[in-house]
Amino acid sequence: MTATLERRESASLWERFCTWITSTENRLYIGWFGVLMIPTLLTATSVFIIAFVAAPPVDIDGIREPVAGSLLYGNNIISGAIIPSSAAIGIHFYPIWEAASLDEWLYNGGPYQLIVLHFLLGVSCYIGREWELSYRLGMRPWISVAFTAPVAAAAAVFLVYPIGQGSFSDGMPLGISGTFNFMLVFQAEHNILMHPFHQLGVAGVFGGSLFSAMHGSLVTSSLIRETTENESANNGYKFGQEEETYNIVAAHGYFGRLIFQYASFNNSRSLHFFLGLWPVVGIWFTAMSVSTMAFNLNGFNFNQSVVDSQGRVINTWADILNRANLGMEVMHERNAHNFPLDLASSNSLPVSLVAPSVNG
């Protein structure tokens, strides 16, 4: 009797790497999108921390008046920010090797572009990674679709808006007070509060918060008890169990009596589809509002739209908002010679009819 033994060739290093990358047994799934996501997000995070702590002032307006944003230059957690790239750079791609020196790159706000572009690439890969893991587990792809909403919003304020305005200096600063400054200036220049897409976005965010609170409270109030009265209801459930953990019929009946019958869902799939759809569509509209206003397709202007029989203006909320916008825009302009267009375009008013005499 003859036994034949065949020696099985060991898998190549590349094949083992591919198997490990795409394995769903890893504690954290990596995936092919993760191969790009991990280094880009690590780069963005590392540069952000270093720049937030120690970056020198940046000439954001391109007028040789640098603005300090880091902690070592006198800021705190609230006032600190990564200052956007200089207006002198515009929307040019500005990597380190395009500058004459590292000092010049820092002075012109190079870290902002580095952080933003790596961040956007990283979170885009995170979308792909969500889809990839869902695909390998046999799940449907809607998790990745939902995550496109915040990514679209980030791309709108960090990339689309600077492109539309012609300079990365118009992008949103990476900091708390910088975000608020961006919001105020955006309102002053584009009247975002009167843009219908932004209004839909507000409805999406606040409505999503309301629906989330309603759903969570209804579920936790209608749990199916699997334990005795002397034991916590939480002990009656196992992670991944097939049985329902709450009684949707009871929740539906409660809410139907609280509001009216057709205000509640009696189908779990349609309920959760609605809970996912509402905020996602709202944030999509918010991203579209910023993207359209990037090219100066601004909010509605109803200024001085109500007049009396004598032609005198009756101020409405739109006029009050317009006055606030003008005030914010004036405060924003750091150049005395660079007035906002809507202030500089009207006829000049004489403030002195006689030149003052200067003695001595």
Swiss-Prot record:
Membrane-spanning residues: 29-46, 118-133, 142-156, 197-218, 274-288
Membrane topology: Multi-pass membrane protein
Site feature Stabilizes free radical intermediate, where: 190
Entry binding sites for a quinone: 215, 264-265
Residues binding chlorophyll a PD1, per UniProt: 198
Gene Ontology cellular component annotations, sorted alphabetically: chloroplast thylakoid membrane; photosystem II
Alphabetized Gene3D superfamilies for the sequence: Photosystem II protein D1-like
Coiled coil stretches, renumbered: none
Keyword check for Metal-binding: yes
Protein location: Plastid, Chloroplast thylakoid membrane
Residues annotated to bind [CaMn4O5] cluster: 170, 189, 332-333, 342, 344
EC main group: oxidoreductase
Family the entry assigns: Belongs to the reaction center PufL/M/PsbA/D family.
Name assigned to this protein: Photosystem II protein D1
Gene giving rise to this polypeptide: psbA
